[in-house]
């Protein structure tokens, strides 16, 4: 196969991918249409534009995002290096001057040997060249049609409607209990019971909680298939007890009675370290989710690894479609990276762009696949988005998806430090030849 790769999109994932390929002697055609045709989320012509926050998250190794950034530094990420140079004061967070950050990345890519930038919309996926699709959550309609053709339309999602996810260890099992409705199954659900007073306290806070403002491009089809929990509550004070909070079929083993309302949580990962709150798709602001959902008995000290979201977010069903190198299982020349894979957040986009590019470069240079285990945070996120599961929803960096330590450490900060230390040691041993 020709040593030329097409990279689609010069966002965070595409910019990192193009750089890593070019650095390894691979010729790159980088397609970026924003100079002629911007998506609704973008306003400038620079590459790697940060459309929301200017923060790439915590730099602390007690934080999974901080660990992922450190792993990217070890691997030689251009974007993290540029972010470090454009850092602005933000405590432990890596926040950047967003214009300085994007301008420098644009300049590097435009002046780099082996990179040809094509300022056009990419609409045809060739058979004879490797393509890394990093077109982001607002992929153009024409490219979207082509992706649909090669993946099957049922494998594409048009928006995010995701419930919050919490860690199992933060759920108070002195209050909550395992049980499946009507005794069917093996008690897979965690149930958080509410009496009448607790339910109405929760209801009253939920309906007046502050919601996130939707951007214009998110409004059209947002609620067609999924009603947010606060909208259900607003339709009637008892409506939730006939929907997501219905108690029927559940007997509380602590009282041998049916409760007034029950919030259910369902296992979200293979190891049982993460649980999502069933039916709690929401458009509440993150701080409000923490405040209101912590009123649920058993979740008073819940650790949220992901908050609920409802926004336009085109992504593929990566768990069904991609292998561990981020290549399509059914098409040997197509890789995906960035938010379109279901990886969430700036740093995850950079990581998947680098990961796909290293694998493509290794393949073209006759070297072995670069596959990281879930001991590292990058390996954990790739494992999460490629490991088959019944219902796939986007996920960003968090310690809940990384492999557990052999020993049980109660102090959370110490545990996270140990996980980070192990990840860094593992990664350094894994990068020979990378």
Model region roles, listed by residue range:
Residues 60-106, 110:
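A conserved beta-strand/loop capping segment in the N-terminal third of enzymes
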Residues 395-434:
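C-terminal auxiliary extensions adjacent to catalytic cores
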């Amino acid at each position: 196969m020709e040593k030329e790769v097409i990279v689609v999109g010069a966002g965070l994932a595409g910019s990192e991918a193009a750089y890593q390929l070019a650095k390894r002697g691979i010729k790159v055609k980088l397609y970026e249409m924003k100079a002629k045709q911007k998506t609704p989320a973008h306003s400038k012509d620079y590459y790697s534009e940060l459309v929301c926050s200017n923060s790439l998250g915590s730099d602390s190794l007690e934080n999974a995002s901080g660990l992922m950034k450190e792993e990217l530094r070890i691997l030689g990420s251009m974007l993290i290096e540029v972010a470090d140079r454009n850092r602005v004061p933000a405590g432990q967070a890596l926040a950047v001057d967003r214009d300085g950050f994007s301008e420098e990345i644009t300049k590097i890519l435009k002046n780099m040997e082996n990179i040809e930038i094509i300022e056009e919309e990419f609409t045809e996926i060739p058979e004879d060249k490797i393509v890394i699709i990093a077109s982001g959550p607002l992929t153009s309609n024409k490219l979207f049609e082509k992706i649909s053709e090669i993946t099957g339309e049922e494998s594409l999602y048009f928006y995010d409607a995701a419930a919050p996810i919490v860690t199992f260890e933060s759920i108070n099992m002195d209050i909550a209990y395992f049980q499946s409705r009507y005794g069917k199954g093996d008690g897979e659900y965690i149930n958080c019971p509410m009496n009448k007073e607790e339910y109405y306290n929760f209801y009253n806070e939920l309906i007046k909680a502050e919601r996130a403002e939707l951007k214009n491009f998110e409004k059209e089809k947002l609620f067609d298939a999924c009603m947010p929990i606060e909208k259900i509550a607003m339709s009637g004070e008892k409506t939730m007890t006939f929907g997501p909070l219905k108690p029927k079929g559940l007997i509380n083993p602590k009282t041998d009675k049916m409760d007034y309302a029950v919030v259910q949580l369902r296992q979200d990962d293979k190891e049982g370290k993460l649980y999502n709150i069933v039916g709690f798709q929401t458009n509440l602001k993150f701080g409000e989710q923490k405040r209101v959902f912590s009123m649920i008995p058993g979740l008073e000290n819940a650790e949220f690894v992901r908050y609920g979201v409802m926004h336009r977010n085109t992504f593929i069903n990566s768990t069904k479609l991609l292998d561990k190198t981020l290549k399509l299982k059914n098409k040997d020349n197509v890789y995906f990276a960035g938010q379109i894979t279901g990886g969430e957040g700036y740093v995850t986009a950079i990581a998947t762009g680098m990961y796909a590019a290293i694998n493509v470069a290794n393949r073209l240079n006759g070297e072995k696949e670069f596959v990281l285990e879930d001991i590292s945070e990058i390996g954990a996120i790739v494992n999460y988005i490629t490991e088959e599961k019944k219902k796939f929803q986007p996920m960003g960096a968090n310690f809940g998806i990384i492999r557990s330590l052999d020993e049980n450490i109660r102090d959370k900060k110490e545990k996270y430090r140990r996980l980070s230390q192990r990840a860094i040691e593992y990664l350094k041993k894994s990068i020979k030849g990378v």
